[in-house]
Amino acid sequence: MKIFLTDISDMNDDIMNKGLKLVPAYRKDKIERYRFMEDKERSLAAGLLLNYATKLYSIYMSYAGEIELKTASDDIFNVKLDELVKSYDTSYDYNIEYAGNGKPVYSGLDIHFNLSHAGTCVVCAVSDRPVGIDIERPRKNAIKVAERFFTQAECDWIGDDSLRFARIWTLKEAYAKLTGDGIAGTVSKVEFRHETSANMASVVNMYISGKKADNIKIYELNIIKQKYVISAMEYIKN
């Protein structure tokens, strides 16, 4: 999995106008349906970022073993909006269809993607396996939500820590987006436990209906600019 991020704080009329001329018709329609400008900007950024991520990942997969796709931290690609516009390549606007559960997927390709946004940040995960990603900002009074939807063990781990709440919430959202089942159907049956591994490292494990899930890889990226929490998941290859 590779994760890409962009920040719409740098959005301006020039980038907006150029970007709208680049993105495919379905994305333009989606942008136009939004009422507020910030939502339009996030949607445009998502379209630009998806094209960029798909392009780089496609090239990477074509030359696997010959080139490396790495960042300074090897965790996330932070890409400026103007770079997304300059690098846009319509040949990577692959046809998107919707699976039976409503999850958008590329038609007939072994490239999977997922998008999320919060505040001024937009993120995109791409992989050769199904993926799910979520980004959130820690929020106050989160414990009330936790008490309603989370397990007792999760609530005990969170306490009154808004960052810990965001970590659990993004994990649940990422799983819901990985499966395409939606948060309402997964929030209560999936539990995340922060445990200690055999070598005494702190790890997060997922339990579905009380059974540990060993077929999913979890990524936690905490925190971007001390404001955001990102969690992502993909299935582990057999």
Region spans (language model):
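Core catalytic alpha/beta fold that binds nucleotide/phospho-ligands
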Residues: M1-N238
